[in-house]
Structures are given as C-alpha cells and as structure tokens.
C-alpha cells in the first residue's frame, strides 16, 4: 500500500473532507508530492511499509502556500520556472528541416540524465535556500535552464545566463547542501546541474559544453 | 522529533550527508571564530611583557585546557577536511558521489588526522605518560 492509497482510504472511509492532489498514481505526473515523515516525496511512489515507521505523518510541502490540507499551490515554483525561461526558443524557427542532435553527442548524453523533471516541486521544498529567499530560482528551474543553455539549437542562452548569474537570487545562492538531489523522485542530480552552471559562468570565455 | 530524525536517517541512509556537512561547517566555523578571539587575546599579552605572556600560556598547559585542545583539533580537522570536500565539489569533482566524498574525506581522512594528533596530546599532555 502506498501513502496515496492510504490517504484515499482515509478519505473514503473516515473523513471525506480531506484535501490532497493526485493524478497518474505511477510517479510520472508529479502531482502528489507532499512531506511524508518530514521528507518531500511522491505519495504514489512511497510504500508505507518501506517507511519503517509506526506513525506516518503526511504534511503539505514546505515553502508553498497551502490551498487545503496537504494540497499546496506550486505558484512560487512555476514563477521561477518562467523566470529561468524554461521554454525552448529556437535559433532557426523557420528552418525547413529538423535539427538533429546525435545520440552520441555530449549534450544528448548529459540531457538524458537531466531532462526527466516532472515538476513535482519536491526539490524546491527540500532546499533550505528557497525557504529563506522566495526570489531564488531553485533547483528545478536551474536544471531546466542548464538544459536550454547547453542546447545547440537554443537562441536565448545569453538571457538565461544573465538570470542565472544574478548574485542575490541566481545560482550563487546555492550552498551545495544536496537536499534537492536527495529528494528528487526522478533521481536527477540537481546539485550537479547547479555546479555546472556556476562553472560555466566562471569561465565565460570557454565554449559552453558539457 | 527524535523519532522522525531517526526515520529520515534510516530511510535515506544518510543521503542528507550534504546537509549534515553544511551544518558541521557552520558550527565549526563559529567555534573557530571564538577560538580566534581567545588566541588574539592571549597573543596580545606579549605587549605587556614576557611575564604576562608566560602566565597566560601557563593557564593553557593545565590538563583541562589540553582536553579542550583535543576538541579544538577536532574542530579544525573537521572544518579543514570538509573545506576540501566543498572545494572539490565546486571544482566539479565527485559531485555525483557526494555522500562517498563526505564519508571518505570529511569523516574518514579527518578521523585519521584527528587521532594522529589527539592520541599524543592525550597520552603526553593530559595523562603525562613517560
């Protein structure tokens, strides 16, 4: 039984008024992230028996406004997502053929480990910096920006780097605590992404490669 | 609270070592700052002549202060080796293996150096073994 199953049972059999969010139930939509026993994780991918605890505590994710019970608004998360310009901006929008990224290219290989973000918001909740500074980009937005910045087809590299380089709310706020990496349900090494962005910013002369 | 901390550590098998290391670095940093103040205070006795300085140093050769010195060594070693870990991470070395980095460098190598210094201090300065 997953924590989500347990909560659904509670809702059906004990208290129909409790509020939580879920959708796919298989860990691919990122809707049901909450704090289970003080760690941000997906309810649908957390088996109660693996928690190895007498009492299972389900709380709303920290650093987000609560809508109802354990359902939170991801508005702060997506505000940063937009600020990092997560959307792809093509260099050649009118190109007659598709740009090809070879499967052996270094960008393609790095992207394979970084592109699985399901925007569940767990990393943003686990990060202690986002808790102190609402303007900080947060791990997911930085990871997304890194993917765009390294993409040879992307046209907005300079804009994105400028946002990432902001001293008070860009990558430099990261203290490499690795909490984001520890909680990511997709096992994305988010701290690694942030370190890569920092190093790229420190060596502007060097071509941005992987 | 304690049970939830225990559950966190159990479940994640110290995946949060990055947070532990960060906290250690802050705490040891503040302790080193306090030590620095004491150190400057003692050194400033030199301006009052050799006798005043010798008196200050004599205070610190008591077994109690020698024990504190072992603690100081531990704080310095933790801060230094964790600093090396942070530098490596910032250089992009071993970021994907941060837990192993914490256990081998900060804890492992730190412990070796700490014991190499702490045992002689304990034997010869505190217990006065000859």
Task: Cite the ranges covered by each PLM segment.
Chain A
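Short beta-strand scaffold segments in enzyme catalytic cores
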Residues: 33-34, 127
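Active-site phosphate-binding and catalytic loops of NTP-dependent enzymes
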Residues: 15-21
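Short strand-turn-strand beta-turns centered on an Asx-Gly dipeptide
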Residues: 35-39
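Aromatic- and Lys/Arg-enriched surface recognition patch
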Residues: 48, 55-60
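Ferredoxin-type iron-sulfur electron-transfer modules in oxidoreductases and energy-metabolism complexes
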Residues: 1-13, 59-210
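Hydrophobic, ordered structural segments
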Residues: 42, 54-57, 68
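Structured interaction patches on ligand/partner-binding surfaces of diverse proteins
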Residues: 40-52
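Short, structured protein-protein interaction patches enriched in aromatics and acidic/basic residues
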Residues: 24-33
